[in-house]
Amino acid sequence: MARGARYRVPLKRRREGKTNYYKRRKLIISGKPRLVVRVLSRTAIVQIAKATPKGDVVIASAHSNELKKYGWKGYRRNTPALYLLGFLAAKKALKQGVTEAIVDIGLHRPVKASRVFAAVKGALDAGLKIPVGDGVLPEDDRVRGEHIANYAKMLKESNPELFKLRFSGYLSAGLDPESLPEHFDSVKQKIEEALQ
């Protein structure tokens, strides 16, 4: 494994594929709080964190399981859910006195209109100042889940068995996938009212 006397072993979190220290260093040098977006295998987390010499301090955080408190019945890792998480985390951060942040997407690839940037759009709409280009943010209809509702409508007409299989989570939670945009609007309104 070693390649000679001068071989330097990478840091542990870099070897494990968890941290890109070159990106992290540039983010920390800015001195601004970071909007940290992490989409995991079953959940998603959006945090506002500040780097200190002893480690990161989380100022505000929103976990996908928190959306249940506000009545969210949909999938907790899709574009509308990540938007709501970004919105929720930013509202909490604004209450703590944070007004601006920079985006930390970790090892996620920066794909235009992706779930990660849906969370950023949610934070922007909540009132947080984040330097980001408009070209990477998803459209409003996609954020509301209209693409999911249209797909559900098409699938319900063409293949009802597959519709029941694909949207079994929505149906068991008592949510018609075709009414996802209206459900999204009501949950966003509840978050806004709760964190005035």
Swiss-Prot record:
The keyword RNA-binding applies. Keywords: Ribonucleoprotein, Ribosomal protein, RNA-binding, rRNA-binding. Signal peptide: none annotated. The keyword RNA-binding applies. One of its GO terms (molecular function) is structural constituent of ribosome. One of its GO terms (biological process) is ribosomal large subunit assembly. Disulfide bonds: none annotated. It comes from the Archaea. Transmembrane segments: none annotated. GO terms for cellular component: cytosolic large ribosomal subunit. Belongs to the universal ribosomal protein uL18 family. Part of the 50S ribosomal subunit. Contacts the 5S and 23S rRNAs. This is one of the proteins that bind and probably mediate the attachment of the 5S RNA into the large ribosomal subunit, where it forms part of the central protuberance. This is Large ribosomal subunit protein uL18. It comes from Thermofilum pendens (strain DSM 2475 / Hrk 5). The lineage of its organism: Archaea, Thermoproteota, Thermoprotei, Thermofilales, Thermofilaceae.
